[in-house]
């Protein structure tokens, strides 16, 4: 089978969903901007050679409906011969898009694919139009459909304290802010047009979601938001609401070499797994174990890890059971995570993979893991290898 490689990866800045810079930009705009941008950065690639576009998106309605991948490709002016499909595995959608593209390349059905994802949570809220089947309650706790309550449950089962959650959240903002100041996001962010508070157009080249002023003491003053009486999960220890898109240029290693492109990473292994929906945030653990087994590697072999921060109460149990708690400052979410940057659902899979690849390059790392939990009880994981 063909070896699948990443030759480039990009993302928009993360915009605040409430009155943020992208409030007048649509999901298709963000997506098309990245599609054009990643091809402009790689002029050796003839767009007509792209077989398919795989684009993750969760709320596929309103501006994100009717196959947003195809809409964005047409908006970007890409050749009409390129196919496009919108992929939905909830929070893992764009990572699933990467897996789908990788398999097409592995078996020879494609040589080049454009991969990514988008979510404009300001325009299309996460709960818009959600209508669970009443019969689900026979098999699944009703609270399993409320992500914050699943985080509360997972945190309680693993003895995660409020203090630990506040410290983890403060770390996320501090690391993301430091990464911004030190220019560590510069290579992965494609400056994107947005609107300032007064409505004037400007180019955003930083993540406006990060709150540099965040402290443990400040977080400790917030009230639990999902279980006000007995809970520990607050808005401050949950992933921020943000708007954004991410993209990757994926191809066979043979094609990359023929085009003279630098191979930034290879896909070493991929996996998905299910878990109890009531503790949906635990999904990264079984998914990671599967991926490691398929790669013939161990957790110790992973030099850098991106664990999507849906909630602090969810991330910490996963880090604990993956044996990462003692390695956090050396390996895990070194540039912060979704608590600081936000979790635009369909965008996050390729967003964390993009951040991971840039970190691997900065640290001259061999192996990296990107993994995330998925609503209703799933996990997804990808292991990358640098050449």
Curated annotation (Swiss-Prot):
Residues annotated as catalytic? 91, 343, 373
Superkingdom is: Bacteria
Per the UniProt entry, what are the Gene Ontology biological process annotations, in alphabetical order?
fatty acid beta-oxidation; phenylacetate catabolic process
Which molecular-function annotations from GO does this UniProt entry contain? Answer: acetyl-CoA C-acyltransferase activity
* Documented EC number(s): 2.3.1.16
- Reactions accelerated catalytically: an acyl-CoA + acetyl-CoA = a 3-oxoacyl-CoA + CoA
Highest lineage ranks of the organism?
Answer: Bacteria, Pseudomonadati, Pseudomonadota, Gammaproteobacteria, Vibrionales
Gene3D superfamilies annotated for this entry?
A: 3.40.47.10
Q: Spell out the protein name for this chain.
A: 3-ketoacyl-CoA thiolase
Family membership noted in the UniProt record:
Belongs to the thiolase-like superfamily. Thiolase family.
Alphabetical list of PANTHER family matching this protein: 3-KETOACYL-COA THIOLASE FADA, 3-KETOACYL-COA THIOLASE, PEROXISOMAL
The principal location of this protein is cytoplasm
Q: Offer one Pfam family short name for this entry.
A: Thiolase_C
Where does the record place it?
A: Cytoplasm
Q: Which UniProt keywords apply?
A: Acyltransferase, Cytoplasm, Fatty acid metabolism, Lipid degradation, Lipid metabolism, Transferase
Pathway(s) it belongs to: Lipid metabolism; fatty acid beta-oxidation
Whom does it interact with, and what assembly results?
Heterotetramer of two alpha chains (FadB) and two beta chains (FadA).
Cellular component GO terms, alphabetical = cytoplasm
What does this protein do, in the record's words? Catalyzes the final step of fatty acid oxidation in which acetyl-CoA is released and the CoA ester of a fatty acid two carbons shorter is formed.
């Amino acid at each position: 089978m063909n070896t699948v490689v990443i030759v480039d990866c990009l993302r928009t800045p993360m915009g605040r969903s409430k009155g943020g810079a992208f409030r007048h930009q649509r999901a298709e705009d963000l997506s098309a901007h990245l599609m054009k941008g990643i091809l402009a950065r790689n002029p050796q690639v003839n767009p007509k050679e792209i077989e398919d576009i795989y684009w993750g998106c969760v709320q596929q309605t309103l501006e994100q409906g009717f196959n947003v991948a195809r809409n964005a490709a047409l908006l970007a002016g890409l050749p009409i011969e390129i196919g496009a499909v919108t992929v939905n595995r909830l929070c893992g959608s764009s990572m699933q898009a990467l897996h789908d593209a990788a398999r097409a390349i592995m078996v020879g059905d494609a040589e080049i694919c454009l991969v990514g994802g988008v979510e404009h949570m300001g325009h299309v809220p996460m709960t818009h139009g959600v209508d669970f089947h009443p019969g689900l309650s026979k098999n699944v706790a009703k609270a399993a459909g409320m992500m914050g309550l699943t985080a509360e449950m997972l945190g309680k089962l693993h003895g995660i304290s409020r203090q630990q959650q506040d410290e983890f959240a403060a770390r996320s903002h501090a690391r993301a802010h430091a990464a911004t100041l030190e220019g560590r996001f510069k290579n992965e962010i494609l400056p994107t047009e947005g609107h300032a508070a007064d409505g004037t157009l400007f180019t955003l080249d930083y993540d406006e979601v990060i709150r540099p002023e965040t402290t443990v003491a400040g977080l400790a003053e917030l009230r639990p938001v999902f279980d006000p009486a007995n809970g520990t999960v607050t808005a401050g220890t949950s992933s921020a609401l943000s708007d954004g898109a991410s993209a990757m240029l994926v191809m066979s290693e043979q094609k990359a070499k023929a085009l003279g492109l630098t191979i930034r990473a290879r896909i070493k292994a991929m996996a998905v797994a299910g878990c109890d929906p009531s503790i949906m945030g635990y999904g990264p653990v079984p998914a990671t174990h599967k991926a490691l087994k398929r790669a013939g590697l161990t957790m110790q072999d992973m030099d850098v890890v991106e664990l999507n921060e849906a909630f602090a109460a969810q991330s910490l149990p996963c880090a604990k059971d993956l044996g990462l708690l003692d390695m956090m400052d050396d390996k895990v979410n070194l540039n912060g995570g979704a608590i600081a940057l936000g979790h635009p659902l369909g965008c996050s899979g390729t967003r964390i993979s993009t951040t991971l690849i840039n970190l691997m390059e900065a640290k001259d790392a061999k192996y990296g893991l990107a993994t995330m939990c998925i609503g209703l009880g799933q996990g997804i994981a990808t292991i990358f290898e640098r050449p």
